[in-house]
């Protein structure tokens, strides 16, 4: 039995889970999210808790068991609390600004890079930090990764866009002497 899959999901106050034939819909104070169901996974809602179980013991069912439980737990947390991810822009002259649903990055190119945020993701800038927030953890992570990919941190000086708590492995520069 999957150690993650067999744990129950507690539903906070104001969060409801509806089971449809092809999706699980989670509604809460911050919005509504859904995830597709899998034919080998069964869901049961009772007493403010959701139990995820598998219909048989095949390899596919075992693989999906923990995954589907975690996806559902992320939806429950998203519609009740929401998620945030912070990126840091490090480098001389590197700047970040927001205008509506667009993030403008000046990160050493000859032009600023304008990044359009997907629906449901909000951005806030404080100095050199860009804080992204939203209710969908998967979409938030993808968006943060796409912004980081514009100028990933380089190992020599550490310049670029990095996650707030990311540790950059630094390399020594050229060490050859003059002849």
From Swiss-Prot:
Disulfide bonds: none
Coiled coil: none
A GO CC annotation given for this chain: cytosolic large ribosomal subunit
Xref: Gene3D superfamilies: Ribosomal protein L6, alpha-beta domain
SUPFAM superfamilies the record matches: Ribosomal protein L6
Alphabetical GO biological process terms: cytoplasmic translation
Key words, A-Z: Ribonucleoprotein, Ribosomal protein, RNA-binding, rRNA-binding
One Pfam entry name: Ribosomal_L6
Keyword Flavoprotein among UniProt keywords: no
InterPro entries referenced in this protein's UniProt entry, alphabetically: Ribosomal_uL6-like, Ribosomal_uL6-like_a/b-dom_sf, Ribosomal_uL6_a/b-dom, Ribosomal_uL6_bac-type
GO molecular function, one term: structural constituent of ribosome
The keyword Chaperone is annotated on this UniProt entry: no
Subunit structure: Part of the 50S ribosomal subunit.
Biological function: This protein binds to the 23S rRNA, and is important in its secondary structure. It is located near the subunit interface in the base of the L7/L12 stalk, and near the tRNA binding site of the peptidyltransferase center.
Family indicated by similarity: Belongs to the universal ribosomal protein uL6 family.
Protein name: Large ribosomal subunit protein uL6
